[in-house]
A protein has these predicted regions:
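ATP/nucleoside-binding phosphotransfer catalytic cores, i.e., glycine-rich phosphate-binding loops
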Residues: 118, 126, 131, 142-145, ...
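Glycine-rich phosphate/dinucleotide-binding loop and adjoining beta-alpha-beta core of small-molecule
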Residues: 49-50, 55-78, 82-85
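Gly/Ser/Thr-rich active-site loops/lids in small-molecule metabolic enzymes
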Residues: 134, 148-192
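A residue-level signal for conserved active-site and pocket-lining positions in enzyme catalytic cores
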Residues: 12, 48, 74, 124, ...
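A glycine- and small-aliphatic-rich helix-loop capping segment at beta-alpha/alpha-beta transitions
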Residues: 64-68, 86-91, 170-179
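Catalytic core of DAGKc-family lipid kinases
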Residues: 80-153
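ATP/NTP phosphate-donor binding region
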Residues: 1-46, 50, 58, 62, ...
Length: 267
């Protein structure tokens, strides 16, 4: 990659990262890199995120439209999507600013709801809008009706989102590079509901079939709408791709072992 001239900076909104930010400024000054902060233009070559996976998610969504690659420095707990440890800021960013990074293209999700289009980086979830209430969801994949499933919800996750809520509910991890999404139920009340991996060009249609429980639709953890009885939403792979920047030697499997392997993060 070419060396970096301008870098946008995204920070965790509720954490004091002033010390880390000072370290980033020092590296940028030595490397001759201009830093851009919230509200500043300047067409950055890369975005540097100081935080964990939640802040990375916000950064990937923010720069999705203009195609700016996003690189994370981990100041969170898990940091699966981040490339540099918090105590390696100087060495890691010096390499990045010198052009030592590569880009992983990650698929996103498109959700159609009431004529509106939404894009998710991690996942979309349809769940009960009332805490503790079972919901009945009818779902179809690729135009094939697969019936009504009593459950707590349904997750559609991208490869990068497959290690989040999907993983916690027993769904498979999708390796970076797969152009696919995974459909996983949350606490299904059956022995037969299993996760399904779905490719590009296939629609997932989900409808609320509970007469007395509204369904909530969430995109990357944020609620966007409720579905009454008979109302539904459609999810598919979107044309847009997130651009995740990592160090050249890093791979999905090295990150997977470091973050989710035995003994990682206190597990």
């Amino acid at each position: 990659m070419q060396s970096v001239e301008r870098a946008a900076v995204v920070v965790h909104s509720r954490k004091d990262v002033s010390v880390a930010l000072g370290r980033v400024r020092a590296v940028a000054e030595r490397s001759g890199v201009e830093l851009l902060f919230d509200g500043e233009g300047g067409n950055p070559d890369i975005a540097i995120v100081l935080g964990g996976d939640g802040t990375m998610l916000r950064g990937l969504a923010r720069f999705l439209e203009n195609g700016v690659p996003v690189l994370g420095v981990n100041f969170g707990r898990v940091g699966f999507l981040t490339a540099i440890k918090g105590d390696e800021v100087e060495a890691g960013l010096a390499r990045v600013f010198d052009g030592e990074y590569r880009i992983v293209e990650l698929p996103t999700l498109e959700l159609e709801l009431d004529g509106q289009r939404h894009v998710a980086v991690n996942d979309t979830v349809v769940t009960s809008a009332e805490l503790g209430r079972l919901i009945e969801l009818q779902y179809a994949i690729g135009g094939e009706d697969l019936g009504v499933q009593p459950c707590d919800g349904l997750i559609c996750a991208t490869p990068q989102g497959s290690t989040a809520y999907n993983l916690s509910n027993g769904g498979p991890v999708l390796v970076w590079g797969l152009d696919a999404l995974v459909v996983t139920f949350v606490a299904p009340h059956t022995l037969h509901a299993r996760p399904l991996v779905v490719g590009r060009g296939v629609d997932i249609v989900v409808e609320n079939r509970s007469p007395d429980v509204p369904a909530a639709v969430l995109i990357d953890g944020d609620p966007v709408a409720n579905l009454a009885l008979g109302e539904g939403a459609t999810v598919r792979l979107a044309p847009e791709h997130s651009r995740l920047a990592i160090l050249p030697e890093q791979t999905f499997f090295t990150r997977y072992g470091q973050v989710f392997g035995p003994g990682a993060n206190g597990r």
